[in-house]
Amino acid sequence: MNMESKVILQGIRIKRMTHRIIIGIGSNFQPTENVRRAGALLTRLFHDCEWSPFVTTEPVGLHSDPFLNGLLRASTTLDEAEVNRLLKDAESRLGRTPTDKRNGKVVIDLDLMAFDGQRRHERNWLFPFQAQLLKALNDKPNNIIDII
């Protein structure tokens, strides 16, 4: 679902495509606080933000505390590589460090789950809660973060 947006810079008209993205958000360390902080940052980085509810899930493949997980659907004129770089930068700004995950601590996890309807991170889509979150996002998206 690409739409064109026109940007005029010093009299030069540049066409940029608008892309629809879905971002997976998760945290198992002070999750309510960290998800809210991530949400505040993501709403400044992307447009037309719609949120699924956030749900608590048990960790898979980690010995850790439960996770708080949710999805964000948004629009951007950035390409896929730029979105991924922006998400990794956001994780760092929000306090994620390379050693944390090895220790079972996930301050924040931001994954590009879909770009223009094409799924990414296929393994993550296999988690049962992802289907629940996507259904909720499609049925009744929220304009604000709803933490259950």
Regions found by a protein language model. Give the residues of each.
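Short beta-strand-to-loop capping motifs
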Residues: I25-S27, L72-L78, A114-G117
